[in-house]
């Protein structure tokens, strides 16, 4: 059975041509699926009964089931657990900002990157998500939480480790017949898979790129993020500079501050040296406490010291507000708790 949500508009046009139908049927189906949110072919009244019958035999339109929904009493952040068709479980998050609602989307079940501070890494990667499963997260959050205007691929998983499905997902949500979310309202976050950064730069999309950096030198980054052993900082920075030159777009560097690990003055100065002259922004993140890992966030005094050093060097810097700390909104936390409790 074909899941129609796994098809870009061009793929769906080809699908209908192969059925002996006109390719304009694809736009009709896209409208039913993404505008009217209809999953029952019998309700698609501008499509002939014969074609509806044929579609029921060979295709379906997926939906995600919400199995848990936690609302933060602090900031209205909502954490979702979704049940996939194969009974795997993934997380999504809805975040309210002044400029609109953001959906934080997972790209894999679990993650293989083994970052030492991340709950998603505990247990490793189970499998990649299909484009439809990413689309369904956005649509489920949109239906439950309210209109989604921004997407961040910062949930569980490494987007560039599932590159082709992520690119397909972007095409579907960005399509004017799809979810109509502008590319500049979509952000991809990567730990730094260098060949994929070059490939992504060459796509010349207007999608935002965020790099999970978290350490200013190779020794510390090797310890915190094993990906650095494959692609050390020199290679990562070279790829980032290529991306900026190719796209003329700013990169955001994410830096999770961990008490006593990467939050010293020397680390801030090393970070400044690393990013000097780049079109970039630094986003400091107070890390979420994960019991199995044991890292704790830096205190406010250290965060402000770190921020001041970066800003004094002429690099823009913000501190991300803590989101959903009362509902285990960090990557992988709620899923792991749910699986442990059975």
Curated annotation (Swiss-Prot):
Keywords: 4Fe-4S, Cytoplasm, Disulfide bond, Iron, Iron-sulfur, Metal-binding, Methyltransferase, rRNA processing, S-adenosyl-L-methionine, Transferase, tRNA processing. Disulfide bonds join 104-331. [4Fe-4S] cluster binds at residues 111, 115, 118. It is found in: Cytoplasm. It is an enzyme of class 2 (transferase). Its main location: cytoplasm. Pfam families: Fer4_12, Radical_SAM, RlmN_N. It comes from Caldanaerobacter subterraneus subsp. tengcongensis (strain DSM 15242 / JCM 11007 / NBRC 100824 / MB4) (Thermoanaerobacter tengcongensis). Belongs to the radical SAM superfamily. RlmN family. It catalyses: adenosine(2503) in 23S rRNA + 2 reduced [2Fe-2S]-[ferredoxin] + 2 S-adenosyl-L-methionine = 2-methyladenosine(2503) in 23S rRNA + 5'-deoxyadenosine + L-methionine + 2 oxidized [2Fe-2S]-[ferredoxin] + S-adenosyl-L-homocysteine; adenosine(37) in tRNA + 2 reduced [2Fe-2S]-[ferredoxin] + 2 S-adenosyl-L-methionine = 2-methyladenosine(37) in tRNA + 5'-deoxyadenosine + L-methionine + 2 oxidized [2Fe-2S]-[ferredoxin] + S-adenosyl-L-homocysteine. The keyword Membrane does not apply. Residues 97-326 form the Radical SAM core domain. One of its GO terms (cellular component) is cytoplasm. This is Probable dual-specificity RNA methyltransferase RlmN. Reaction proceeds by a ping-pong mechanism involving intermediate methylation of a conserved cysteine residue. GO terms for molecular function: 4 iron, 4 sulfur cluster binding; metal ion binding; rRNA (adenine(2503)-C2-)-methyltransferase activity; rRNA binding; tRNA (adenine(37)-C2)-methyltransferase activity; tRNA binding. The active site is at 91 (proton acceptor), 331 (s-methylcysteine intermediate). Its EC number is 2.1.1.192. Its cofactor is [4Fe-4S] cluster. Specifically methylates position 2 of adenine 2503 in 23S rRNA and position 2 of adenine 37 in tRNAs.
């Amino acid at each position: 059975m074909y899941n129609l949500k796994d098809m870009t508009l061009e793929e769906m046009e080809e699908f209908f041509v192969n059925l002996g139908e006109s390719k304009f049927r694809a736009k009709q189906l896209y409208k039913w699926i993404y505008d009217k949110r209809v999953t029952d072919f019998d309700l698609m009244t501008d499509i002939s009964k014969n074609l509806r019958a044929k579609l029921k035999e060979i295709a379906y339109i997926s939906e995600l089931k919400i199995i848990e929904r936690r609302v933060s009493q602090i900031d209205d952040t909502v954490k979702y657990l979704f049940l996939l068709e194969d009974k795997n479980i993934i997380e999504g998050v809805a975040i309210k900002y002044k400029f609109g609602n953001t959906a934080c989307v997972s790209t894999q079940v679990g993650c293989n990157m083994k970052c030492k501070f991340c709950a998603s890494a505990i247990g490793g990667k189970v499998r990649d998500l299909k484009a439809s499963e990413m689309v369904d997260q956005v649509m489920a959050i949109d239906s439950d939480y309210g209109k989604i205007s921004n997407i961040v691929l910062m949930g569980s998983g490494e987007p560039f480790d599932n590159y082709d499905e992520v690119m397909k997902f972007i095409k579907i949500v960005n399509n004017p017949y799809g979810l109509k979310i502008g590319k500049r309202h979509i952000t991809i976050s990567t730990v730094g898979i260098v060949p994929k950064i070059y490939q992504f730069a060459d796509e010349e999309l207007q999608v935002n790129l965020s790099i999970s950096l978290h350490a200013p030198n190779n020794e510390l980054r090797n310890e915190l993020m094993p990906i650095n052993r494959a692609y050390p900082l020199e290679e990562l920075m070279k790829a980032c500079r290529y991306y900026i030159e190719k796209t003329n777009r700013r990169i955001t560097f994410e830096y999770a501050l961990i008490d006593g690990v990467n939050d010293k003055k020397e680390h801030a100065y090393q970070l400044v040296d690393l990013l000097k002259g780049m079109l970039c922004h630094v986003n400091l993140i107070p890390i979420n406490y994960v019991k199995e890992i044991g890292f704790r966030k830096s205190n406010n005094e250290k965060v402000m010291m770190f921020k001041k050093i970066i800003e004094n060097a002429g690099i823009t810097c913000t501190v991300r507000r803590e989101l959903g700390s009362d509902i285990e909104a960090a990557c992988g936390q709620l899923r792991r708790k749910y699986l442990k409790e059975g």
